[in-house]
Amino acid sequence: MAAIPTPRLHRGVTHLSRQTKSRARHPMSTPQHTPMMQQYLALKREHADKLLFYRMGDFYELFYEDAEKASRLLDITLTARGASAGNPIKMAGIPYHAAEGYLARLVKMGESVAIAEQIGDPALAKGPVERKVVRIVTPGTLTDAALLDDKRDNLVLAVNMVKGVLGLAWLSLASGEFKIMQASVEDLASELERLKPAELVIPDDTGLAAFEGISTPKKKLPPWQFDIESSKLALTRHFGTRDLAGFGADTLPVAVGAAGALLEYVKSTQGVNPAHISALSVEDAGELIRMDAATRRNLELTETIRGEASPTLASLLDTCATSMGSRLLGHWLHHPMRNHGKLARRHGAVRALLSRYQDVHAELDQVSDIERITSRVALRSARPRDLSALRDSLTALSGVKALAASLDSELLNELAGVLPTESPVQKMLAAAILPEPATFLRDGGVINDGFSPVLDELRAIQTDCGDFLLKLEAREKERTGITTLKVEFNRVHGFYIEVSKAQSDKVPDDYRRRQTLKNAERYITPELKEFEDKALTAQDRALALEKQLYEALLDQLAPHIAELKLIAQAVAALDVLSAFAQRAAIGNYAEPQFVPEPKLDIVAGRHPVVEAEVERFIANDTRLSAERKLLLITGPNMGGKSTYMRQNALITLLAHVGSFVPADSAVIGPIDRIFTRIGASDDLAGGRSTFMVEMTETANILNNASEHSLVLMDEVGRGTSTFDGLALAWAIARALIEKNRAYTLFATHYFELTTLAGEYPAVANVHLSAVEHKDRIVFLHHVEDGPASQSYGLAVAQLAGVPAKVIRDARRHLAELENQSAARVQPDLFSAPAPASEPELSPAMDRLQEIDPDVLSPRQALEILYELKKLAD
């Protein structure tokens, strides 16, 4: 993006000295101010938490503290002009035609902006021109194409927490998708990672501890706006329903509270009713494979661990022709499904597209972002080129429809059925909008020729002006005999007939003098005056009529919003399925098979992203079942353990979003969750060490993994002392085998853990092979049965460039340690007696665990206290 130039300043503006800056504080008692500043301050009071863009002619001006802040954030000049209430008025301005670029920068910084436009006619105003805030731009409520990321949904999320229950409501204003769910408060972090909202809406009495370390901009609302009954009323009024049962939301009161607050907040920012928000849907976590925040980060689904957009799974798969497809792809990757029937339909569609994806892409290349254009139509913010793009996109869909309908896939045929053959919207727009309309309605040149006879006549006056003047000049020369006569126009005096002074005595009686010059006279005739009146008003009248016709067209499009949203969804799904087919064809992916029994059987699996980045990738098998639940993986650092574990998680995830998978074959049983404990770093904002982060993630796995979960554990226990880490790793592995019984890939450098395979039939040792030759190590990246023979730590250090002297010292010290270890008998950590069972709890402790202090009245609490004392005695 080109740099936005600093706007030209008004003449007579002086820079503020430091001394002046320190004095420029404005009192809010408006009688001391000029009428215009009174108007500004009244608007500012209503939007005190936002920057106020105040329209003055061709500029948006910011005043006082807003001017200081904008100057700092946008690097525009801070100035002062005049005074109000005895203080210099700090101000900074930006040209209105460049406002979108500045808004984009402010929104990326998390700022919200209220835009006040002139709505009165300056010619009729006796005081300041009437102004009002017509739009509020916040990070989560963007709809303008210039402010949005084409490939990512822009969500605003409302959070409501009541007695340990988490209610979430989120909305993409750019698409109209409105969803809710309820969960446990402990799920907040994972949901924020999944949804990645651009803005949070929370009650202002919510404790900030819950949002510690979360940099997402937050809008705080009064708690009463989250009231359940008020929210139900707001939602049913908006949707025109008696209750929320039809949406499945009647049993989710905390989420309904969030949804009501969110809807009212969004309405307050738009200035119009968001009619495209036509339904509320409940997200059922039970239908999805759940992943916590750490898992989504570690698998690098849509951004790398470093926060970059590539290389990720999404960047690899995203060959979508439309922005709608790219956004839906990201959504699918974060929402893997458990329903094998629905997945089989997606896999069938991918199979049918394997030889036709190029044709689908060619057709979809002509389709614009129907989804976001539809939302702008509903919000009445659609620009002329939005409508021409919508018209052209609907025209192009006939080819896509025919292609999808011809393929052997139930899902593709259903999607084809949604696409129109002849769209009434397309016909309406073809008649109303010019083939290449102007960018902005204010410039005219938007409404098609022939759509309005009155508009055609007004345009003809402007177009025929030159011809009329030439004909009039020729006729007047012939009538008067004045060969030097000229008919001309200027902005000051309008149209006139100019005659030299030497021939001014020849002018007819109907000539009326308009201006006298040194060597000429200028005249006007009744005919020329009549034409002048028509010509000078024709442009203004044409612009006013175009605006009127455009607004009427938006009204006519409103009933078709729901239909257009369905079309957009169908196009996006076709686009994603075609991208899946392209990756499957290029990467030689296999169609996965689902079975009801516990199984994860992958033959020649590959890591999809790493495979695309290297010349040659070593494929590996994975076999897990009810009898073989945990693979204990050993081998050298850089040997490929982490890549091997991640590839199995990604293959599993790809199968559950409807894609083919990078393997020769994959047979997968029921999966409910995917967990990863891979890598860690200090959580400085949360005040947690690397080891604390590691243990928190491990605790989450041990407390929530089931026999249908896939668990990846990499080097657990390495962040503490050797014996502490070894003991923890052993106990964690044991718990995963005995209690959770999850499918587990457990990578470790603690070779002592390999003895677990002798204790538990469900444990199998595997290792990543490597060979050492002349103090050099070669990683083979191949998974083989059995434990690794050694760690190759010194060889890896040498490969990393550690100085040779350090390597020699390490070898010498390693030999000494190995000799000492062989000379003394070391206690066998794993032959120690089984841990004693936990002591039975006392009756008082049993009773204490049953109590929920949040629901007790003071009297009940006192009674229970006496009861506990009696039990303790």
Curated annotation (Swiss-Prot):
Region named Disordered: 1-34
Residues the entry annotates as binding ATP: 635-642
Entry keyword annotation includes Transcription: no
Source species, domain of life: Bacteria
GO cellular component, one term: cytosol
Cited NCBIfam families: mutS1, PRK05399.1
Biological role stated in the UniProt entry: This protein is involved in the repair of mismatches in DNA. It is possible that it carries out the mismatch recognition step. This protein has a weak ATPase activity.
Entry protein name: DNA mismatch repair protein MutS
Species this protein is from: Chromobacterium violaceum (strain ATCC 12472 / DSM 30191 / JCM 1249 / CCUG 213 / NBRC 12614 / NCIMB 9131 / NCTC 9757 / MK)
